[in-house]
């Protein structure tokens, strides 16, 4: 009986650790996107603000750099 209870507690602890790690990774991804700007917004790749996922920073007329939609090339 003690063995079964010990295994259940061990399983619960392993599950809690795995869940905490995946939650932390998700929060880090969200924090990385928080300060981003969208299409046709002013950006600066070297210092920020950075473009959101799916966009890239292009500087045709420095210092007027803007985010453009990434075509996936």
Curated annotation (Swiss-Prot):
GO CC annotations, alphabetized: extracellular region
InterPro entries noted in UniProt: Beta/delta-agatoxin_fam
Domain notes per entry: The presence of a 'disulfide through disulfide knot' structurally defines this protein as a knottin.
GO MF entries: sodium channel regulator activity; toxin activity
Function (record text): Insecticidal neurotoxin that modulates the insect Nav channel (DmNaV1/tipE (para/tipE)) in a unique manner, with both the activation and inactivation processes being affected. The voltage dependence of activation is shifted toward more hyperpolarized potentials (analogous to site 4 toxins) and a non-inactivating persistent sodium current is induced (site 3-like action). Interestingly, both effects take place in a voltage-dependent manner, producing a bell-shaped curve between -80 and 0 mV.
Residue positions, PTM Serine amide: 71
Disulfide bonds: 36-52, 43-57, 51-67, 59-65
Name assigned to this protein: U3-agatoxin-Ao1c
Organism name: Agelena orientalis (Funnel-web spider)
Alphabetical UniProt keywords: Amidation, Disulfide bond, Ion channel impairing toxin, Knottin, Neurotoxin, Secreted, Signal, Toxin, Voltage-gated sodium channel impairing toxin
Distribution of this protein across tissues and organs: Expressed by the venom gland.
Miscellaneous notes: Negative results: does not affect mammalian sodium channels (Nav).
Cellular localisation: Secreted
Keyword Signal: yes
Oxidoreductase found in the keyword field: no
């Amino acid at each position: 009986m003690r063995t079964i209870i010990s295994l259940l507690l061990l399983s619960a602890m392993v599950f809690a650790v795995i869940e905490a790690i995946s939650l932390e990774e998700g929060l880090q991804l969200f924090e990385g996107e928080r300060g981003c700007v969208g299409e046709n917004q002013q950006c600066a790749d070297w210092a920020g603000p950075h473009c959101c996922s799916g966009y890239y920073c292009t500087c045709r007329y420095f210092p007027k750099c803007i985010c453009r939609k990434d075509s996936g090339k």
